């Protein structure tokens, strides 16, 4: 796909803009399990009188159709109540001169390779060099930087993957070197990845990994705030074995939060009892054992959660930030084993 092709595509279909960008950046390697998280569904239900909306999730979701195994999930202390927040956002856009300044910080020429005109008067500024591409979105403000062939830049290099503490420090240093603010973000998660020609797999063995992904989010009263999807946090940095940043996504937000209502939460026992019936599988990646197979996302035939945590999430199409439980663990499909994330509304009926 050429940049002109991309321009035409984006003008026709704004909802798939991040997917199209991802195609340019990675050659499609991440699409197998991430493309569904890039699609935006219709806005979730929101009450005209300001009532708390029903939990829904952006992008495709799946269910746990088979067995739920709780043997590896330790009982977790969860709060009995929390606050639902209303979100206010002041719209700020990145201008072309600002996009050019950002490009210079990443050692690109100031002149964009292409300008893509988006609906509502917004733009995407594309910068390209021999090995790397970058897209700067005017609004919502976002930077996406990546090597054109991430697989080659990870699979064909040698070295030792950073440990988590070193990686967090290096990620912050990298962002600060590009003059990207880090004061309002907190570390969220680490994933050891195996980039291969066919797909991206996840592993718990750092020695098997050829890339390390770190994600950062905003937090409120100590609780993390997810983005619209679990695979699209506020900041995502991917290192290869040599410590080179091979992929970066960085979003800026101008949100403020005001307390709306104190609500009661499901207990640990109530949450686990409800997980199979009401949980939504929101992301999955093949395990190392399944990385050679073509796995199409589908309902899980089994799920073994290993952790459960309370996080916040803004329901699509609403101004409400609500609490949800996020469970992480291993699941199975007919085609193989995956690492999966399952979201469940934390609000007690």
How should each PLM-predicted stretch be described?
Residues 154-163, 167-325, 329, 333-336:
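Segments that shape or occlude catalytic/ligand-binding pockets
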Residues 130-146, 239-244, 321-322, 348-349:
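Short, solvent-exposed coil/turn segments at beta-strand boundaries
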Residues 1-216, 220-227, 251-260:
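Preferential activation on post-signal-peptide N-terminal prodomains/segments
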Residues 331, 336-349:
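Short, low-complexity, Pro/Ser/Thr/Gly-rich segments in the mature regions of secreted, periplasmic
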């Amino acid at each position: 796909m050429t940049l002109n092709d991309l321009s035409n595509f984006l003008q026709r279909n704004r909802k798939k803009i991040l997917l199209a960008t991802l195609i340019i950046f990675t050659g499609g390697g991440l699409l197998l399990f991430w493309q569904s998280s890039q699609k935006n569904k219709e806005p979730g239900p929101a009450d005209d009188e300001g009532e708390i909306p029903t939990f829904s999730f952006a992008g495709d979701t799946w269910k746990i159709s088979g067995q739920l195994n709780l043997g590896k999930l330790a009982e977790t202390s969860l709060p009995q109540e929390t606050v639902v927040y209303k979100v206010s956002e002041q719209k700020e856009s990145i201008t072309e001169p600002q996009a050019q300044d950002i490009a210079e910080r990443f050692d690109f020429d100031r002149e964009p390779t292409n300008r893509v005109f988006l609906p509502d008067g917004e733009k995407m500024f594309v910068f390209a060099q021999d090995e790397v591409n970058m897209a700067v979105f005017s609004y919502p403000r976002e930077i996406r930087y990546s090597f054109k062939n991430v697989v080659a830049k990870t699979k064909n290099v040698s070295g030792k993957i950073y440990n988590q503490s070193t990686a967090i420090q290096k990620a912050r240093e990298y962002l600060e070197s590009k003059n990207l603010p880090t004061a309002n973000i907190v570390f969220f998660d680490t994933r050891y990845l195996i980039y291969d020609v066919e797909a991206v797999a996840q592993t718990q063995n750092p020695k098997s990994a050829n890339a390390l992904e770190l994600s950062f989010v905003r937090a409120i009263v100590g609780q993390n705030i997810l983005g619209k999807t679990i695979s699209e946090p506020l900041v995502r940095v991917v290192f290869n074995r040599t410590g080179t940043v091979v992929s970066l996504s960085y979003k800026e937000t101008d949100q403020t939060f005001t307390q709306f209502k104190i609500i009661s939460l499901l207990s640990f026992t109530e949450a686990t009892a409800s997980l199979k019936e009401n949980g939504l599988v929101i992301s999955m990646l093949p395990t190392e054992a399944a990385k050679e197979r073509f796995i199409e996302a589908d309902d899980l035939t089994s799920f073994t959660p290993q952790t459960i945590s309370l996080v916040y999430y803004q329901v699509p199409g609403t101004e409400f930030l609500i609490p949800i439980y996020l469970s992480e663990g291993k699941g199975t499909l007919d085609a193989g084993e995956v690492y999966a994330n399952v979201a469940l509304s934390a609000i007690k009926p």
